[in-house]
Amino acid sequence: MTTVLRHPRPGFMWDWWAVDAQGFLVQFSCGPAPEYLLTHMDRVDAAAAWAEKYCPDWFGDPPQPLHAFSCDGELPVFTRDNVPASPLRLSDAPEAIAEVAALVELRRAVGDVWTVYLDDGWV
């Protein structure tokens, strides 16, 4: 079954999180997300607000311990921003972010993949 992907706010930046098949936290910036996540936009927005306020203190100086991907368009293609030396597990993530990440379980581990095509069986 294919997951429907949709961008909640075309033309605007937004962040959302997922957990990969190995239990690591993955951050996605911009681009589309699984449509069912959009029913939880209040939680996604709360997590993004938390991240904006506390990420520098929580995650430390760059590079952050996150598998982070960004999208520069409406297509479900995300490119990696960095490869963390010691990636953060979902169980170690702040509660606001972990609640959102737990809603989207990726079927694969991001590992050292540089490009994620969400419409290619990842979600």
Functional labels for PLM-detected ranges:
Residues 1-44:
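Short N-terminal edge-element motif at the start of the domain
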Residues 44-123:
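Low-complexity intrinsically disordered segments
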